[in-house]
């Protein structure tokens, strides 16, 4: 983990400049427990981190299974994730099968490969691929059987890869306008396909591109899109847990229709471009990113996930006096010290210009695009079950995603067994599951101070918006930014991972 030790040195002003994915063997007990007791509390309730384990914060840890795990194994993993946030399972055979879609061209072949791999081992699966679809060189065969590597957010599969990514903001698109949807996904597909012309200087990346050219077209705001498409009844179905009733079956059929149509548009566009320019076709073109930061640009619910609430305060971390944060102040947004800025008594600072303050939180009142639809206010998003989230995630995984779908399923302690059963069944029945993050769910209305997302009422939202207007001294944000940005490069900007997935402060412990 030397790379994580190096990463610690480039974290500036609490702004993450490193993100990693560390994949360990399923039987590596030391790796499985590496992050246990990472955080502890003193007598006053203040959190501190074990300095010997500080570098482990720089990456996610995943255990890779090459056989189908038992229900008990999955249950233990889900339980561990509830208590520590770590211990995720990755099912490698599904990842390898998807990454060989140029030869495993349908579900039956994919499932046959997975069964051979899981029951007879990797070597037998390798021989089966070579005898059925080869012969391949040893180098290419090694590459094909190693395509279960993940990028830091888990949405791209490959081996020695760089992947060109693009994203469609579905919350900006009319569900009834298929032509608009087609244009958006076609534009995204072309924007990544053209980068396949790039030639890497590093030999191993050149070889990987030669064997396995990959692109990834993602979307964000799927939840918003579906609310606009199906209305409040869809939200109520979610609130009921997405049951398998007649109405639910109709909703799922329509969801699948949208997802599959977008996938086909992307693949056809990328392949047409590659054929025209004599490039090898990628065998997987679609993915879903976590989309935390980019979703802020249009107020989209990130990726496939539901939003935190219909209305909330969004807090974004900046270093103190960052030009963007200063421009936000001129634009009317409030700024407060971050969670890591405290006085000598451990109390949060209130004045962003206090000399002891090193980081700022810009507070932005946010309203989702469907907040004012009749009945939408009556839906408690925070009560959406883990199984409902998992079901929607698997819809995306089955009907749109060809790589993997970046997912964080939030769950409560009483949902551990049900969620473990759902994951185990998805793996056991070859339904397409590879890996997903699981996060213990806190109450959306908990009184923790200065959370990244803080749900608010409609009345609070209107009041905060009025205050933004009152404080505004410049109606042109770009002009305000030019006032403070002198064009110099800085070591820090908006936090790359401004989500609620890492709620504990990143301040270093005192010696």
What feature does the model see in each segment?
Residues 1-170, 174-175:
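Active-site cavity-forming subdomains of large catalytic enzyme subunits
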Residues 3-10, 36-39, 44-48, 53, ...:
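Short, well-ordered alpha-helical packing segments
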Residues 5-11, 167, 186-197, 217-228:
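Short, hydrophobic/amphipathic alpha-helical patches that form generic packing surfaces
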Residues 14-64, 196-206, 210, 214, ...:
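Internal maturation/activation junctions in enzymes
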Residues 79-82, 127-174, 179-201, 208-211, ...:
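Catalytic alpha/beta core of large soluble enzyme barrels
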Residues 91, 297-298:
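Short linear motifs in exposed loops
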Residues 501-504:
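Short linear clamp-binding motif
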């Amino acid at each position: 983990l030397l790379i994580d030790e190096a990463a610690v040195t480039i974290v500036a002003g609490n702004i993450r400049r490193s993100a990693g994915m560390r994949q360990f063997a399923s039987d590596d007990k030391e790796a499985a427990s590496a992050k246990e007791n990472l955080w502890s509390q003193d007598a006053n309730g203040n959190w501190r981190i074990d300095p010997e384990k500080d570098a482990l914060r720089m990456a996610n840890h995943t255990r890779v299974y090459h056989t189908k795990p038992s229900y008990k194994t999955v249950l233990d993993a889900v339980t561990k994730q509830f208590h520590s946030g770590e211990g995720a399972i990755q099912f490698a055979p599904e990842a390898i099968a998807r990454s060989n879609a140029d030869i495993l061209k349908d579900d039956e072949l994919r499932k046959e490969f997975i069964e051979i791999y899981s029951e007879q081992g990797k070597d037998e699966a390798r021989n089966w691929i070579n005898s059925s679809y080869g012969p391949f060189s040893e180098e290419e065969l090694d590459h094909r059987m190693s395509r279960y590597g993940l990028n830091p957010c888990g949405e791209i599969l490959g081996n020695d890869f760089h992947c060109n990514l693009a994203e469609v903001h579905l919350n900006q698109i009319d569900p009834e306008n298929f032509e608009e949807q087609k244009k958006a996904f076609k534009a995204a597909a072309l924007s990544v396909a053209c980068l396949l012309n790039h030639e890497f200087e590093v030999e191993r990346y050149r070889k990987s591109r030669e064997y396995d050219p990959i692109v990834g077209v993602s979307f964000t705001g799927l939840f918003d899109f579906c609310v606009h498409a199906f209305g409040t009844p869809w939200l109520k179905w979610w609130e009921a847990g997405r049951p398998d009733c007649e109405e639910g079956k109709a909703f799922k059929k329509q969801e699948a229709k949208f997802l599959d149509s977008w996938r086909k548009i992307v693949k056809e566009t990328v392949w047409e471009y590659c054929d025209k320019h004599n490039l090898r076709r990628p065998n997987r073109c679609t993915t879903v990113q976590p989309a935390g930061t980019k979703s802020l640009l249009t107020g989209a619910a990130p990726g496939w996930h539901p939003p935190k609430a219909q209305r909330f305060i969004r807090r974004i971390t900046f270093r103190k006096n960052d030009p963007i944060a200063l421009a936000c102040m001129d634009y009317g947004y409030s700024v407060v010290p971050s969670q890591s800025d405290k006085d000598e008594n451990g109390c949060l600072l209130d004045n962003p210009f206090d000399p002891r303050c090193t980081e700022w939180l810009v507070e932005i009142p946010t309203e989702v695009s469907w907040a004012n639809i009749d009945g939408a206010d009556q839906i408690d998003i925070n009560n959406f079950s883990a199984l409902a989230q998992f079901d929607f995630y698997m819809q995306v995984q089955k009907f749109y995603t060809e790589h993997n779908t970046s997912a964080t399923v939030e769950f409560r302690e009483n949902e551990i067994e049900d969620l473990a059963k759902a994951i185990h069944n998805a793996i056991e029945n070859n339904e397409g599951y590879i890996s997903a993050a699981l996060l213990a769910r806190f109450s959306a209305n908990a009184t923790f101070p200065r959370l990244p997302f803080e749900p608010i009422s409609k009345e609070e939202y209107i009041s905060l918006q009025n205050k933004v207007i009152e404080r505004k001294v410049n109606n042109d944000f770009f002009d305000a930014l030019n006032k403070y940005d002198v064009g110099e490069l800085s070591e820090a900007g908006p936090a790359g991972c401004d989500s609620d997935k890492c709620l504990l402060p990143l301040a270093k412990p005192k010696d």
